[in-house]
């Protein structure tokens, strides 16, 4: 178990959303990996924060949830009220510790935190990327899963993250080629890479 995992083992959410965001940015590579998305919103009069992995979340469900949350005008709203009255989705639960949040976000759920609340909401709006059952032609002799990559970068990063739910997995996106400006993703495990080069 690495140092970061040990640090979050017993840490519960704070009521201060800025403290929570700081811890989340330490346990998930939000600023380093382009596929981990954070979104700041306002619910009623309170600051709120969402974090999720691009490629796992069903866009239409998230759009409906945001359409339900953004018009809220109540100045004080509890997590219970949000879950039972405002979020139009079935697969919703609360969480109070960062370890569960990290595990669920890396598995594809959306974490929602609201300022002033010491518990958050996990929205299971996952849609795992899937391919047809045929295996790639060139890899018939290899062991393990038979996932093959496709032309879409987000789909490919989600396929990899589905198999490797490690917070140290980083995807960096770059554009290469003078004229083609092709998007290329470099994937690596932060705790194995040689940072000297």
For every predicted segment, state its role.
Residues 1-197:
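Membrane-embedded alpha-helical signal segments
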